[in-house]
């Protein structure tokens, strides 16, 4: 499956608590039987997300690399992606048949974006718990990501979020770009996301 250009690199961004690690876990488990998969996680001062993915048994531990970005996590995925590119290069050496690498950013704000040198496809994750107004607030993650994931839809009634309003706002803000509602705790929506990656990533 591996292309001449190396593995498909999928950037997963979004605010703290939106469900990035849960999405990464579910994607690994959904795709690992068909593809050679690895993960690079970004945390400011720890490798907590990488350790969590190992505990969740998303992949064998040698396929998960945690990098400590220090300071602002968006710098490591945008202005200077060297630390992430080095981690991917190391995984490529270890697994020459690598098909897909998921790059999970540290929790950041709505302005965070991935450098095109780092990610071929970008997924941006938000949570209904952050408020139904999040899609209309815009920002590059909302408007320009290849796929917007609106997670924790099951909690909408408990936090006063109207999914119809979020659907309407996401449609308006993203024009023709796709988005999906999900409940990563139960894996609801994961099949649509995997199908998107297969189609858009040429897997």
From Swiss-Prot:
It is found in: Cytoplasm. One of its GO terms (biological process) is urea catabolic process. It holds the Pfam family cobW. Its main location: cytoplasm. One of its GO terms (molecular function) is nickel cation binding. Keywords: Chaperone, Cytoplasm, GTP-binding, Nickel insertion, Nucleotide-binding. HAMAP family: UreG (MF_01389). PANTHER family: UREASE ACCESSORY PROTEIN G. Facilitates the functional incorporation of the urease nickel metallocenter. This process requires GTP hydrolysis, probably effectuated by UreG. Belongs to the SIMIBI class G3E GTPase family. UreG subfamily. This is Urease accessory protein UreG. It comes from Rhizobium etli (strain CIAT 652).
